């Protein structure tokens, strides 16, 4: 009896802590009623986009016979405006032409843009292309701000061991920071944005929304491209809102029946944003909805194991999920039995949807929930034993997996249907280098942002503490700086794998998109937990139509 009372008091304190550190939802029922545009407007927008899409396709055919610099600018503009997904085939052909013509005598600005785009698209191009621009000491000196910006972006698609790109990054970052306040407004805006988030690491929709505003101010803009990008953005925004209406209804029912509000973060809209960062294209509407449902369950499990259930309850609940039958949960308290029933109901509905789509991988879905629960339960053992792993690598063997990124990539592949083969799913399940790199970025970036909160909340020891122990650093700041170096190494691994291409770029790009999403969410704060910090961005992507 005393033990039960102690657990109840402990749980009460946990719930008080939960409400103290996690704000309530910012959205409520908003998307049940929000209609960005009238049906008639939506139909007109789609008709106009269809016409403009064909016009741009003709333009791309003409660009094929233009000079290299014009090709690069055209591709770069389409990508920044978020229109490139309409022209995958055409851009692939242009990039092939660009690669074949790469040995031309180009200036430093064009060389930097060429290098960036080729590497971004998975082409092997040596960083030695920059050697000819160095002085007697090997330093590349220029005071042209646009050139510095192009070099800075190029340096962010480096791989381990490319000293020349390491030096370019250090030099250009320092110089851009020094001159940014003196630049003309449009270029100043571009440089500030680049210093905050390099082009290669930006989310497609966030980048498109920002660049549409910048492009509108350009004296050399193509007005048809500008109008096309606005309409396309608004069409996707409207589609996302339709998805959020369906998801809001599902989440309200799940939350009410499972009674998760007392301990779990209410972040359904933010979760949709997370999934939209990985799959933004209109054809992946089902992927976004399916993944949002699954990872809202994962988010609930994270909070459940982290601060609500006792160790004994966590063990029993994990065992029940592993059995995945009605009898398995009998040893759990009522609130966990209810949660268990609702989790199984959601997973069953997803499996049925996938079966209707003739998706042969439907049976793999429940494995995500089971494996994530096992990861979270394993972490509680470290917490209870107050165990500090000796090395960051040891820590990451468990904690990187519990970031959920490997599971998200695998489940994302499943949701893509025939786009992802059985071989691709098997590859993803082996924890390949690019997926490991994404998991590392997610875990380390999360730990940097959540260190202070978790250090005072008796949760699992973070990689920050482990790093301090491994490297003998005397301050948290030194440990965090080392963690940031590990994050940069992970980004270089991502670039390396995109050049090696163990799978088609169409699949690898999902892993890269996930890394970009994690970078965004955990750049300055934990944007998922404290979603007030990203509310303005979410408004611009879900609420505010572009005029």
From Swiss-Prot:
Q: Which domain of life is it from?
A: Eukaryota
Concerning SUPFAM superfamilies, the annotation shows: Terpenoid cyclases/Protein prenyltransferases, Terpenoid synthases
- Tell me how the cofactor is bound: Binds 3 Mg(2+) or Mn(2+) ions per subunit.
Q: Which residues bind Mg(2+) 1?
A: 302, 306
For the ligand (Mg(2+) 3), the binding residues are 446, 454
- The listed location of motif DDXXD motif is 302-306
Write out the catalysed reaction: (2E,6E)-farnesyl diphosphate = (-)-(E)-beta-caryophyllene + diphosphate
Look up the EC number in the record and give it.
4.2.3.57
Under which pathway is this protein filed?
A: Secondary metabolite biosynthesis; terpenoid biosynthesis
BP-aspect Gene Ontology terms: defense response; diterpenoid biosynthetic process
Top-rank EC class of the record's enzyme: lyase
Arranged from A to Z, the UniProt key words for this protein are: Cytoplasm, Lyase, Magnesium, Manganese, Metal-binding, Plant defense
As for subcellular location, the record says: Cytoplasm
Spans traversing the lipid bilayer = none
- Annotated binding of Mg(2+) 2, by residue: 302, 306
The UniProt similarity line reads:
Belongs to the terpene synthase family.
- Protein name, as recorded: (E)-beta-caryophyllene synthase
Origin species, per record, is Zea mays (Maize)
């Amino acid at each position: 009896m005393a033990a039960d009372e102690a657990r109840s008091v402990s749980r009460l304190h946990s719930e008080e802590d939960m409400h103290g550190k996690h704000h309530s939802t910012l959205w409520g029922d908003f998307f049940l009623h929000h209609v960005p545009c009238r049906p008639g407007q939506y139909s007109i927008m789609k008709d106009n986009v269809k016409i403009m899409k064909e016009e741009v396709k003709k333009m791309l055919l003409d660009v094929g016979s233009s000079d290299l610099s014009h090709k690069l600018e055209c591709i770069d503009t389409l990508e920044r405006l978020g229109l490139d997904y309409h022209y995958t085939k055409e851009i692939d052909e242009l990039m092939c032409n660009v690669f074949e013509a790469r040995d031309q005598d180009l200036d430093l600005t064009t060389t930097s843009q060429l290098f960036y785009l080729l590497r971004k698209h998975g082409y092997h191009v040596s960083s030695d292309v920059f050697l000819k621009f160095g002085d007697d000491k090997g330093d590349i000196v220029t005071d042209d701000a646009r050139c510095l910006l192009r070099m800075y972006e190029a340096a962010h698609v480096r791989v381990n061991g490319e000293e020349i790109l390491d030096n370019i990054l250090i030099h250009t970052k320092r110089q851009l920071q020094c001159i940014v306040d003196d630049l003309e407004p449009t270029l100043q805006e571009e440089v500030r944005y680049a210093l905050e988030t390099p082009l290669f690491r930006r989310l497609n929709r966030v980048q498109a929304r920002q660049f549409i505003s910048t492009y509108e101010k350009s004296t050399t803009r193509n007005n048809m491209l500008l109008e096309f990008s606005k309409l396309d953005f608004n069409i996707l925004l409207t589609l996302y809102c339709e998805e959020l209406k369906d998801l809001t209804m599902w989440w309200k029912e799940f939350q009410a029946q499972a009674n998760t509000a007392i301990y779990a973060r209410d972040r359904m809209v933010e979760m949709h944003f997370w999934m939209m960062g990985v799959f933004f294209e209109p054809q992946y509407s089902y992927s976004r909805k399916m993944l949002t449902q699954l990872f809202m369950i994962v988010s609930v499990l994270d909070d459940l194991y982290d601060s609500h259930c006792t160790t004994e309850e966590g063990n029993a609940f994990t065992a029940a999920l592993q059995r995945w039958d009605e009898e398995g949960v009998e040893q759990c308290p009522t609130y966990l039995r209810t949660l268990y029933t609702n989790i199984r109901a959601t997973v069953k509905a997803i499996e049925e949807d996938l079966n209707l789509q003739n998706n042969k991988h439907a049976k793999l879905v429940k494995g995500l929930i089971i494996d994530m629960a096992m990861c979270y339960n394993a972490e509680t053992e470290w917490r209870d034993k107050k165990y500090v792993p000796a090395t960051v690598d040891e820590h990451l063997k468990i904690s990187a997996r519990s970031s959920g990124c490997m599971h998200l990539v695998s489940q994302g592949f499943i949701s893509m249907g025939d786009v992802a083969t059985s071989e691709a799913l098997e590859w993803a399940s082996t924890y390949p280098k690019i997926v490991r790199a994404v998991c590392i970025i997610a875990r380390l970036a999360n730990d940097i942002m959540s260190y202070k909160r978790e250090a005072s909340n008796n949760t699992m020891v973070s990689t920050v503490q482990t790093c301090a122990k491994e490297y003998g650093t005397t301050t948290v700041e030194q440990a965090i700086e080392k963690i940031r170096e590990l994050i940069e190494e992970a980004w270089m691994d991502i670039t390396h794998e995109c050049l090696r291409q163990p799978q088609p770029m169409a699949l690898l790009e999902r892993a890269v998109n996930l890394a970009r999403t994690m970078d965004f969410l955990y750049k300055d704060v934990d944007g998922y937990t404290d979603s007030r910090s990203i509310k303005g961005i979410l408004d611009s992507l879900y609420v505010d139509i572009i005029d």
